[in-house]
Amino acid sequence: MGALLLLAIVWPDANVAAQTAAPPPAFVYSDGYRTRAKIHKIGSLAMVPLLTTQGLIGRSIFNEPTPGKREWHGRVAWGIGGLFAANTVTGAWNLIEGRKNPNGRKRRLAHGLLMMAADAGFLATALQRPDVTRPDYGGQRSRHRTLAFTSIGLATAGYAVMLFGNR
């Protein structure tokens, strides 16, 4: 009888063990994740001056269009497009790799969705480039500008989610 009592004390009940579950292990990111995150952050920092420059050139074209301004507007647009492509690849890849990490998941997902919406908006902006030879040039300009500023707004919101939400 004493042996059973000793066994009961030494051998914990299965229910007690189930009630005190160990915390989940820390999430470990790969070296590739960290490299992509670094590229992504550098690209994000470069985006702010590019978008500002593009907005200023675009406003100048809207007020007083010249061929030189249009050329520079196109060059900066290609730069923004390339940078967005790189950040979309690195960001989406890291979003997929980090999908099982519960810490900051909603913030990362909100950022990713906002930036993908901005991607689509910038593509639509490029496809809606005004053509001076068309009779509806004024309407095209307005649509292009609206798409551009909406896309910039989405990108800014996505940027802010990570900048201010990353404790």
Describe the residue ranges of each PLM region.
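Amphipathic alpha-helical coiled-coil segments
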Residues: 81-92, 123-126, 155-161
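Short, charged, amphipathic alpha-helical segments
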Residues: 68-79, 108, 138-150
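N-terminal targeting leaders of membrane proteins
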Residues: 1-75, 83-105, 163-167
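Generic hydrophobic-segment detector
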Residues: 30, 34, 81, 101, ...
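Hydrophobic alpha-helical transmembrane segments of polytopic
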Residues: 43-50, 76-83, 111-121, 147-154
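Short, solvent-exposed interaction modules
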Residues: 93-141
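Terminal recognition/anchoring or ligand-binding modules at protein termini
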Residues: 139-167
